[in-house]
Amino acid sequence: MSGFVAGEEAVKSALSAATWIGAASPKYSHLVLSRVFNIYSEYIYANGFKLTRENLIEDFGTRPEDVDPFMKIFGGPNGIATYLTALPGLLPILPHPRNIPIIVPLFCVFTVMTSLAVGLRLWSRQKVAGGIRSFDWLALAGFGLTIIYGAVSVYHSKVSGPYQAFYDRTWDQMKENYKVYLVLTIMYPFIMGLIKISLLLFYYRVATLNYVQWAVYATGSLTIANSIAAIITHCLAFMPIDFWNHFLQSPFKFNSRTPMLVFGAVYILTDVAILIIPMPMVFQLKLYPREKVIAVIAFSLGGVACVASGFRIWAIDEFQNYSGKNSSGLMIDAWTMIELNLTLICASAPAIRALAIHYAPKILSTLPSAFSSSGATRGSKSAGSSGKSKTPESEKSMQVSQSPVIPKEVV
């Protein structure tokens, strides 16, 4: 038998059986479900190849309202004994894939990187742009929630255990896994919406072109609508929402995989829009070539977050519904963590660039000194009135506010 491996359909059947048997056996919720398979088989043989309603309630702890649905799944009172005694014979050829221990390293690395990026952003806003603005506080809130998301993902990794397959876990693990994953699924659209809105508010504050402001309105409205729809959809996918306690009562109202793919695709669309919105303002600036290249790069880093969003959609498509090949959602957690952190890091890049120019102008700019927000405005006015050679106003503005024009709240 050791040379044979169960086919995909057989594996999927065993995975499904594990969830139903676990939900119907509260007395054995602490045991690995493959062991519970054997307990059922041994019990049925010892009981004259029978498994009655009373047996389930008294000896396995099945709730009375769960007995009939449980028996129906396995073919009724006659079929259930046959199925459950045959199931242990499948165990020797079932695969036992392990979870990749990637969540904790990702959490540690990105916590350090994102903390540094957000810290430098706030320092830049305070030192160069004259103070921390409302959109910076929103980004800071998004950063805090991203850290919480990562910490919950670490817990999700812990409760999932070392193995992917449901039959290699206990029902207690399964219930906690369902609970934590639902929390993560609801958290994601809220955090992503918060980060995107903070960036759009920044663009709105620095925009002078009407069509750019309208683009901000449209993208912001789409982002908010998508986030609200995602949260509501995830909450309505299960009724009651604590479906792990009502697993045999058909709590699954619809498959959330397709909506998650749609919401993810809309977020990518907004990523592209946010990437394009500042470009007209950047290209209109009369900067030295090296400075313009740096500005374009700083505002284009969001493309990296777009790529991460694409990989997250791939992970949802691959891992959201269990199959004979995959039965763990930890890769979705991993790509979501990567996407959220990269979005924050990329959103902080323009501010970090301004801070670098402020303290090291010879490295990132041909200008000999740093500027304050008030100095940039007064300098351009005096240049026009006196005719003296001055640094272009547009270049100062970019250094002060990380944008093509001086923010409205700075001047």
Swiss-Prot record:
Residues 371-411 are annotated as: Disordered. Disruption phenotype: Decreases cAMP levels following exposure to C.elegans. Decreases trap formation following exposure to C.elegans; formed traps exhibit abnormal morphology with a single hyphal loop. It holds the Pfam family Fung_rhodopsin. It comes from Arthrobotrys oligospora (strain ATCC 24927 / CBS 115.81 / DSM 1491). It is a multi-pass membrane protein. Residues 372-389 have a biased composition (Low complexity). Glycans are attached at N321, N326. GO terms for cellular component: plasma membrane. Interacts with guanine nucleotide-binding protein alpha GPA2; to activate adenylate cyclase and positively regulate nematode trap formation. Keywords: Cell membrane, Glycoprotein, Membrane, Transmembrane, Transmembrane helix. Induction: Induced following nematode exposure. It is found in: Cell membrane. Receptor that senses nematode-derived signals at the cell surface and signals via adenylate cyclase to positively regulate trap formation for nematode capture. This is Receptor GIN3. The keyword RNA-binding does not apply. Residues 1-99, 156-181, 249-262, 314-328 are extracellular. The keyword Cell membrane applies. Belongs to the SAT4 family. The gene is GIN3. Its main location: membrane. The chain crosses the membrane at residues 100-120, 135-155, 182-202, 228-248, 263-283, 293-313, 329-349. Residues 121-134, 203-227, 284-292, 350-411 are cytoplasmic.
